[in-house]
Amino acid sequence: MEHYSLAQLSKALHNREFSSVELTQHCINKIQSNKDLNAFISLDEDQALKEAQSADLVLKSGEGKPLTGIPMALKDLFCTKRLNTTCASKMLANFQAPYDATIVTKFKQNGAIIIGKTNMDEFAMGSSNENSYFGSVKNPWDRERVSGGSSGGSAAAVAGNLVPFAIGSDTGGSIRQPAAFCGISGIKPTYGLVSRYGMVAFASSLDQAGPFAKSAEDLAMILHCMAGFDSKDSTSVDRVIPDYSAEIKNPVDKIRIGLPSCFFQPQVEKGIQDAIHDAVKLFENLGAEIIEIDLKLQPLWVPCYYVIACAEASSNLSRYDGIRFGHRSKSASTLIELITNSRSEGFGNEVKRRILTGTHVLSSGFFDAYYLHAQKVRRLIRDELITTLNSVDVILGPTTPTTAFKLGEKIDDPIQNYLADVFTVAANLAGLPAVSIPTGFENKLPIGLQLMSKHFSENRLLAIAHHYQQHTNWHLANPNKQR
């Protein structure tokens, strides 16, 4: 059953081929037998099995929804009343939220079973999932390599067949990069399509929740459940949500694919370049028109992103002071010492680095030179991408410049870690939807293909990704067989 698509799982559950209890117990067993992946921070076995029993009764009555009885995992920055929400940080190691995030409520209403919460880079800051207070996540394809970050636990859980699907967040590539490293599919929706209420903030103008699954078809099914207006989120957009599952099956004709030359630089591994060119040839053989495009501002993507992201992180994380909630230092005799020591003890090195960077660029002496300038550049980047997407349906390229690197290889070189996001951050800066799907292997490690499209064009984006997966088998590869 672990190799079923979500649609197949749903059909099998509705046809009573196996029960939700059996499926949930199977997932629990897989999680327990793959603890070395370190994909999960918390597991809610008893409650998951209780909910599975209830789901079986609903399914028996014939009133089940598409996700009824299907287990799932949540990145540990979505608030849940039952389980702690740690953000993989000592600062929130014992924090239990008083409410559920909006997407948690939506999944519960649609009958999905939250089996546990996954490991991540602390406060979603990282590209390798080595910055977690609870230890690094291992890649199911090679346990000596990273799973990607910051949603590495969710990606590893799906790639390792521990759960059928999982939810992550994407601030600069934190869904797409782990999806690429782990050989699965993942989408960052348009900013505002999915509610951020109850998702602990890293950089509020960049953060967006999205799903991990094996295929674009599965992503469509999950996204339909997640998307929609939420009055509790001031950035949520009120618009009609298409039936993504139905629309990906529509014929995909006359695709115009933009291919940026800047995506094929020397620092991009040759095996990745070859795999992307093979994908382009396949699209061309299927009738797509390939258009060479020039993204002149691409060299500014990463510096612009890190100025803005760190500035917003500095502001958002100022609330963790040891007074209202979170870690409280025991070695303090004054208020200033309490705040200083609580933050020094509670935050890890990467989080401290980004807070310091953000505080610096927001300071009175550097605000205009860095933060204000970055915001102006962000607008130019957005305008360039939107103008380009007026002449093409999607922008195609590699998700990452390398395959998954070894654990510890880049941990002392933050710049190299930041450059892992070189192709992904633009979608966040512009608020555009982007999907990563598997497109081959290099030295037995997965390669990801990224497709980026116009605002709120997830239906077209997923249809093109699904079209590609109907003519390839990369998304069906299994790390357990590879090993």
From Swiss-Prot:
Catalytic residues, chain numbering: K75, S150, S174
The reaction(s) this protein catalyses: L-glutamyl-tRNA(Gln) + L-glutamine + ATP + H2O = L-glutaminyl-tRNA(Gln) + L-glutamate + ADP + phosphate + H(+)
Gene assigned in the entry: gatA
Family: Belongs to the amidase family. GatA subfamily.
GO biological process per UniProt: translation
The name this protein goes by in its record: Glutamyl-tRNA(Gln) amidotransferase subunit A
Keyword terms, alphabetized: ATP-binding, Ligase, Nucleotide-binding, Protein biosynthesis
Matching InterPro entries: Amidase, Amidase_CS, Amidase_dom, AS_sf, GatA
Domain of life according to the entry: Bacteria
EC number(s) from the headed UniProt entry: 6.3.5.7
Quaternary assembly: Heterotrimer of A, B and C subunits.
Described function: Allows the formation of correctly charged Gln-tRNA(Gln) through the transamidation of misacylated Glu-tRNA(Gln) in organisms which lack glutaminyl-tRNA synthetase. The reaction takes place in the presence of glutamine and ATP through an activated gamma-phospho-Glu-tRNA(Gln).
Single GO MF annotation: ATP binding
Pfam family, one: Amidase
PANTHER family found in the cross-reference section: GLUTAMYL-TRNA(GLN) AMIDOTRANSFERASE SUBUNIT A, TRANSAMIDASE
EC top class named in words: ligase
Gene Ontology cellular component terms for the protein in this record: glutamyl-tRNA(Gln) amidotransferase complex
